[in-house]
């Protein structure tokens, strides 16, 4: 079945947060495995009273709070073995090849694939939708983006395109060798992209799109998003982040060492399942793709600096950037456009270097919260060869956070 739809410091009084967490209704310990889960009612971080950093989120607390940014997702969940999908991010709704955006890529640990990244960093431009999927589908996705790009009105004579495609390996839950992501899945995700600024649905999180088959810290991972809006005195800009989480480490939420008390293997034993056959349960390996959007007027050099800060959000949740972890951050500005028809020069706005620090902080905080959201919203998934990844249990997590933040 294909389902398509289309985020550290803890603030506030600790005592208030502890009381708030304890008064929320408890939910089931784990979500039953499902190939097509119903509407996701699992909480986001702020539903648990958690906040991250100084700045407030935008209205949707999503990457689509950055004006013009679009997100589309296609989830592939078919039979017992297919658990994968596509997530597409569009910097704007126009012709991206003819009206490119300033962009950059920061590579923290390059054990992975990010097709198109070398040209992005060479030219400082992004000219296609950004697509996330699974490891073996990046090549088919890149081909689909190229075909989609040259087919757009106004691109009839375009002889090239630079698809930007990232991945994580979902082969534990998904029959990755089956190459189930097809060209029409990619174009469907792009075409069905919706933005909160256009009145569309919020970005769906958890076990959806490119996060359908991913695992993080031994729990079910997925897609997460968050945003920050700077006050007018600091520019009034918005920073939005979207993540695809499939990595490990020692899970830490809002500074609380969750990994010490709440572990996937222990939860599996409560079901009579040893959990020992899950290599992700105690592994720091895996990958994380981070996409950072902003309406601040930044050039490619500044955007690479912004992307680098997003990696610090991974560190806050306990990532150690292990040998086998492919950790990439893509950043773009919706303000600085580069016209394909430009001749010798074109003017751009550029933010002063001293004004970057609030944006850096916003990117770190939004990345941290997006990762936490990806875990909280993820539902339990059973897939390839009956492998199973449990959603992190909300009642136990709530009690742990409450006791630690009291």
Question: Where are these predicted regions, by residue range?
Answer:
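Sequence-pattern detector for short linear motifs
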Residues: 6-8, 17, 274
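Bacterial N-terminal signal peptides
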Residues: 12-25
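Alpha/propeptide regions of enzymes that mature by internal proteolysis
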Residues: 29-406
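N-terminal secretory signal peptides that target proteins for export/translocation
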Residues: 1-11
């Amino acid at each position: 079945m294909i389902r398509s739809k289309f985020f550290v410091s803890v603030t506030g009084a600790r005592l208030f947060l502890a009381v708030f967490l304890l008064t929320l209704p408890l939910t089931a310990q784990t979500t039953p495995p499902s190939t097509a889960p119903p509407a996701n009612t699992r909480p986001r971080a702020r539903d648990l009273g958690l906040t991250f950093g100084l700045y407030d989120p935008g209205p949707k607390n999503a990457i689509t709070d950055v004006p013009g940014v679009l997100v589309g997702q296609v989830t592939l969940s078919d039979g017992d073995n297919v658990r994968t999908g596509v997530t597409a991010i569009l910097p704007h709704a126009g012709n991206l090849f003819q009206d490119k955006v300033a962009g950059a890529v920061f590579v923290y640990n390059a054990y992975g694939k990010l097709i198109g990244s070398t040209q992005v960093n060479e030219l400082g431009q992004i000219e296609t939708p950004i697509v996330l999927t699974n490891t073996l589908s990046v090549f088919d996705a890149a081909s689909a983006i190229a075909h989609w790009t040259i087919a757009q009105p106004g691109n009839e004579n375009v002889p090239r395109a630079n698809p930007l495609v990232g991945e994580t390996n979902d082969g534990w839950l998904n029959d990755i060798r089956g190459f189930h992501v097809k060209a029409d899945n990619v174009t469907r995700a792009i075409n069905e992209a919706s933005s909160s600024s256009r009145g569309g649905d919020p970005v769906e999180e958890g076990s959806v799109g490119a996060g359908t088959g991913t695992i993080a810290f031994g729990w079910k991972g997925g897609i997460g998003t968050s945003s920050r809006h700077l006050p007018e005195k600091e520019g009034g800009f918005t920073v939005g982040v979207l993540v695809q989480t499939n990595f490990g480490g020692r899970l830490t939420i809002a500074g609380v060492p969750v990994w010490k008390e709440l572990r996937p293997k222990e939860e599996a034993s409560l079901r009579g399942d040893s959990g020992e056959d899950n290599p992700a349960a105690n592994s720091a390996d895996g990958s994380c793709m981070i996409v950072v959007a902003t309406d601040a007027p930044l050039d490619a050099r500044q955007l690479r600096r912004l992307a680098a800060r997003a990696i610090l959000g991974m560190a806050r949740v306990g990532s150690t950037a292990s040998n086998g972890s492919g950790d990439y951050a893509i950043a773009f500005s919706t303000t600085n456009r580069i016209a394909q028809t430009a001749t010798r020069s074109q003017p751009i706005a550029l933010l002063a270097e001293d004004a970057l620090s609030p944006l850096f902080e916003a990117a770190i905080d939004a990345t941290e919260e997006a990762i936490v959201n990806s875990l909280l919203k993820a539902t339990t998934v059973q897939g390839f060869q009956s492998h199973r990844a449990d959603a992190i249990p909300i009642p136990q997590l709530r009690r742990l956070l409450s006791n630690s933040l009291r």
